[in-house]
């Protein structure tokens, strides 16, 4: 590897020396051609309005008079570029493209054999070979490479292999003076596309295309711009113009459109005045904001309507605490909300209702369910129990004073049991003591019934038994009061009398039987599973309630 690099380095040095000699020759020729510049300027002025002004014309190869201008501008740049040696690592790349261009471009030399074309060919060869050298020197001389391409191309083309192409490069630079604006626009695209042009220079047809783009990118174009491009010699090379135009047209849209996209929004041409721009901005912004606000408002209004529709039934109390006078109103709102929503089971419905009770009402709600387990599965009974419990708020003050002041009196057993259970939660008393205290304050009629049964050691069992006995007593009264219905010939009432007689003569359960039914979750009244004694269908008051419900419907 090192030997190859050293050999390539030596060859490049020799080539640089040859180029220097060629540069001197070209400088002498430039001096001779400078005398012809005024004549060429006149002819170029005539052709300024012709279609050859395109950047492709600047890239046209055969124009002998352009060499002097290019040489003059390139003279200061060429000697330092040629003198500077390229690194061995960089030498490999230039050798290959230079060799390729040398081998591929001899046929082009045959076509234009004129002396000026040879000068231009020197430039083209210099372009191809020196491209390799500047690529070698890319890190050291990236800015100088642009300036040195012109001078190196002039000598290289004469001796190397691309005399016609050198004419193109020289011819392009001087005519660029007249087309300064067009060339400046083209400079951006070819300058950035130099790496793309270098590989194209190796191909026979594309060599001219890549070289003119490189020559346009060099700053020498602006300095050497002169009307020499319009000489009649350009007609011979005008055939190559379409090729240059194709390459330039293909390369320009790649680079120019992105800057145009960025410039259009930044520099709007319509609002030139600052006042116009401000008015334009003020008008555009509020329009968008108004549309956004309208959409946002309509969306929020719809959302609010939906929320109001869902929360409307619970406007007044989201949670029922201590204002017991509003219980009926709260229950109406709650039932209307639950009907629209619906729940799969009664137990889920009851648990949901319990979430609305807080404060003192919440403290009494759970004992109510504990004292009467059937309420957990029947929502209608729960509502009646709530009304019975919270219908007399003055009794809460008595309940807060303690168990001694709590009496059932003429009230219902569920209400008394609920308040007793609420107070018992705050006392550290045993189950047996609570059972005794509960039974002592019951109504006399219920106490007589309980005395016939075995004593219970669980407060919940005592409460259930007490409620059951009270329901039995109320059921007997209801059955007697409904005797008028029995006389009307309804079949239901005679069947109801049988359980009533059975209940009056029904013996009390033993403690063992009662324990067995509790363990097996059986009804304490009929002994069948699936319901509690309060909901037993065998009871006469249950049959009467079913008849009343049908009558209401």
From Swiss-Prot:
InterPro entries according to UniProt: DUF4939, RTL1-rel, Znf_CCHC, Znf_CCHC_sf
Q: Which Gene3D superfamilies match?
A: Zinc finger, CCHC-type
Keyword Nucleus belongs to the record: yes
Residue spans of biased composition, Basic and acidic residues class: 45-57, 87-113, 132-147
Location of this chain's protein in the cell:
Nucleus
Say where the protein is mainly found.
nucleus
Example GO CC term: the record gives: nucleus
What domain of life is recorded for the organism? Eukaryota
Protein's UniProt keywords contain Metal-binding = yes
Enumerate composition-biased segments (Low complexity): 58-73, 474-483
Question: Which stretches does the record call CCHC-type zinc fingers?
Answer: 523-537
Q: Keywords in alphabetical order, please.
A: Coiled coil, Metal-binding, Nucleus, Zinc, Zinc-finger
- Please give the residue ranges the record annotates as the region Disordered: 38-274, 474-514
Q: Which GO terms describe its molecular function?
A: nucleic acid binding; zinc ion binding
Coiled-coil zones: 2-43
SMART domains assigned to the protein according to its UniProt record, in alphabetical order: ZnF_C2HC
Where does tissue-level expression of this protein occur?
A: Expressed in embryonic myogenic progenitor cells, not expressed in adult and aged satellite cells.
Q: Where is the composition biased (Polar residues)?
A: 118-127, 239-250, 495-507
Task of the protein: May function as a transcriptional regulator. Plays a role in postnatal myogenesis, may be involved in the regulation of satellite cells self-renewal.
Q: Further notes on this entry?
A: RTL3 is one of at least 11 genes called Mar or Mart related to long terminal repeat retrotransposons. They do not correspond to functional retrotransposons, but rather to neofunctionalized retrotransposons genes.
Q: What is this protein called?
A: Retrotransposon Gag-like protein 3
* Name of the gene this protein is made from: Rtl3
